[in-house]
Amino acid sequence: VAERNFRPHVNCVRPTPDNKYLCAVDNGIDQVKIYRINKRRHKLELVDILRCPRESGPRIIRFSADGKYAYILFELSNEIKVYSYDGSGENPEFELLQSVSTLSKKHDKDAIHNAASGLALAPDGKHLFCTTAGENTVSMYEIDAETGLLEKKFTLPISGDYPKDLVIFPDNQHIAVANHASNTITTFKVDYDNNIIVMNDKPHKVETPNSIHMWPVPQDFEAVKPLSDEEDDEQ
């Protein structure tokens, strides 16, 4: 599923919750570079490098709601690594706490044909979701509020091919998955009590979606009325 590119290429850039540092996830050389944000000089200063396992393919970093933990998704090793984060000292400190698989038990030993692809933190800060291409699934993890550690609750199919990204709705009850190879977006309701997802509607056609985001609509927003066939011909 994933073709390895050994050249440096940053896949995700995200500031730490305290806005002191910028984390650049380099999928090509298996590193997460940490830069200090020098606001006075308007520069970035490299202060640390998280050297990940060789050919693990770090792809995305997300931070817990309280800012104490970092979650890094690894595309090639199909896992999420949990790190503690402390930015109170002179330099940032990251400590590896846990590694969990993104794969179902059926494919747990078949990492070569799968690729972890999307990672999203639920608005309630209590759950983490990820997608895995190849087996085409979404997994949900419960976050321990005290330790930041993850407990997998389910890994289920998403009725699409190559789920490259996902987003959780603000109501915390629904997710949408962008399926790159099947040209669709699929939406689901999350049943936290029974640890399942239920598809809301038929897949929505979108050409080769790569990323999916959700933005609040302003109250004064006015939807543009689609042109009729006759009006379209006149344009």
State what each model feature region is:
Residues 16, 24-27, 64, 72-76, ...:
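Conserved beta-strand positions in repeat-built beta-propeller and related beta-rich domains
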Residues 180-189, 198-234:
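Blade-level signature of beta-propeller repeat domains, shared across WD40, Kelch, NHL, RCC1
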Residues 3-19, 52-69, 102-125, 159-174, ...:
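Beta-rich, blade/repeat-based domains predominating
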Residues 1-2, 45-50, 92-103, 150-157, ...:
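Beta-propeller fold detector
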Residues 139-189:
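C-terminal hydrophobic structural anchor segments
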Residues 35-43, 83-94, 141-148, 189-196:
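Short loop/turn segments immediately following beta-strands, especially the blade-tip
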